[in-house]
Amino acid sequence: MTAELNFLDLFLKASIVVQLVIVILISFSIISWAIIIQRSRILTNALKEARTFEDRFWSGEDLNKLYEGLSNRRDGLTGSEQIFCVGFKEFSRLKQVNPDAPEAIIKGTMRAMNLAMNREIESLENRVPFLATVASVSPYIGLFGTVWGIMHAFMALSGAKQATLQMVAPGIAEALIATAIGLFAAIPAVMAYNRLSLRVNAIEQDYGNFIDEFTTILHRQAFGKAPH
């Protein structure tokens, strides 16, 4: 006699605790995949936009015209564009307020650009830590469901005159499914978290490099030195 493994049948026959565990883990998995797809697209676009803006920045276009063009755009600025506009605006403001303090101008401008960069990175990292949470807790939630299910299966034997494997097999099977689903939720989440974190770090590095390069240009202007 062979028994066909039917997930729905095992789920319906499981105890309410195991059912709740399975529902939680499946929900975690669905949310994780939604975050993975959404964040992957956002990070891909952010990296592409950063590279595109840097090409435009180094194309020789006048910085005043570049700033005016970006400021007049109706769609929201993000990434390197936002960092550039914040830095250029702060530099211009500080230079008008106190033109004889170049060091203070540069420090204030860098502070403004770093704050803008931190806000951009925070936006890019939105919801990504949830993947780490899913990766950490899902196996333990699944293990809890397994332990509970096995306890439930053996407690059902307490009133039986003769215990057989056939009597406990369905209960053990439904319990082990909780562990399997826990791993199914955790493995993609931890892989995606590591991958997305690396991409965020790469974008942050690009932003940081741009700030350093832009600061060098502003430093020459603040101290009245022409570029070599």
UniProtKB/Swiss-Prot annotation:
The keyword Cell membrane applies. Its main location: membrane. It is a multi-pass membrane protein. One of its GO terms (cellular component) is plasma membrane. Changing residue 51 to H: In strain: 1479. The chain crosses the membrane at residues 16-36, 137-157, 172-192. The keyword Signal does not apply. It comes from the Bacteria. It is found in: Cell inner membrane. Keywords: Cell cycle, Cell division, Cell inner membrane, Cell membrane, Membrane, Transmembrane, Transmembrane helix. It holds the Pfam family MotA_ExbB. GO terms for biological process: bacteriocin transport; cell division; protein import. Part of the Tol-Pal system, which plays a role in outer membrane invagination during cell division and is important for maintaining outer membrane integrity. HAMAP family: TolQ (MF_02202). The Tol-Pal system is composed of five core proteins: the inner membrane proteins TolA, TolQ and TolR, the periplasmic protein TolB and the outer membrane protein Pal. They form a network linking the inner and outer membranes and the peptidoglycan layer. Belongs to the ExbB/TolQ family. This is Tol-Pal system protein TolQ. It comes from Haemophilus influenzae (strain ATCC 51907 / DSM 11121 / KW20 / Rd). The gene is tolQ.
